[in-house]
Amino acid sequence: MAAEGWIWRWGWGRRCLGRPGLPGPGPGPATPLFLLLLLGPVVADITDGNSEHLKREHSLIKPYQGVGSSSMPLWDFQGSTILTSQYVRLTPDERSKEGSIWNHQPCFLKDWEMHVHFKVHGTGKKNLHGDGIALWYTRDRLVPGPVFGSKDNFHGLAIFLDTYPNDETTERVFPYISVMVNNGSLSYDHSKDGRWTELAGCTADFRNRDHDTFLAVRYSRGRLTVMTDLEDKNEWKNCIDITGVRLPTGYYFGASAGTGDLSDNHDIISMKLFQLMVEHTPDEENIDWTKIEPSVNFLKSPKDNVDDPTGNFRSGPLTGWRVFLLLLCALLGIIVCAVVGAVVFQKRQERNKRFY
């Protein structure tokens, strides 16, 4: 279970993802309780437990190869992207720039964990900067477009690190991290900051920090988890946790960024992909994972994307069945009112006839 990259930190009451310098893998969920009691707080480094599961063919790690050239092994970049010895800059702090970097190799892992070391910084004051970074696991790569420098109506997974509130009516606090799964039928609405297609999100103060900022994305057996380390405390903080997510294998990892009238430097320092050693049922093993359509078993109604100041959504979202039942009850109510009204009207007419 060490390779799963999780630990139950004794006394914390929550699980944390591991990365170098952070608490790493410990006893997994299947570990007997008496062993947990005997072992107590087991803490290790992910580089010890997971180094052999780092997938270098899908990872971007310093020292970079190809500095000063227009290409590098295993990765392609386009647009305004520049490669330096310290970082990959997707966009400079200039207006109307787009850039991206994409892995050469399609990923055929069913269970994985991506750690991203990034930095968003610039000279713009509050709400005078933009637009943010997008992290991708998608069917198509190197296709520029309006969604943080990449294409709209994509197939796959996107994690948006949005720094500018386009919707002036929103109460959410920016910067904001959100998740979207798409089968090509959905369009990202910048004017609403993607609220209509967002699965979940959280406020995350990652811009212009004086220390390193990290994000971790974990996908395993239909569960998608996003965590952040933004406070220089070597601790992961929960951001997003969704179940029922279906993603195919054979898609590509990438990162992109875009600026408009407002701008920022958008830098990627590293992207490290770890393979998670997870047991699957025989039925799951027999599935052709390359043919799976990106989907989520549970999608929120857009009306449920009503923010509170903390960036959380109200509970009790309206599913399709709930909307149907609500409309059915409303229709029945109208029919009952109409019938009662007709009966009352008829009785009044009969009463009036008797008087004449």
Swiss-Prot record:
It comes from Canis lupus familiaris. A carbohydrate binds at residues 96, 131, 164-166, 190, 260-262. The chain crosses the membrane at residues 323-345. Expressed in kidney, liver, intestine, lung, spleen and heart. Low expression in brain. This is Vesicular integral-membrane protein VIP36. Disulfide bonds join 202-239. The gene is LMAN2. Residues 346-356 are cytoplasmic. Residues 45-322 are lumenal. Monomer. Its cofactor is Ca(2+). It is a single-pass type I membrane protein.
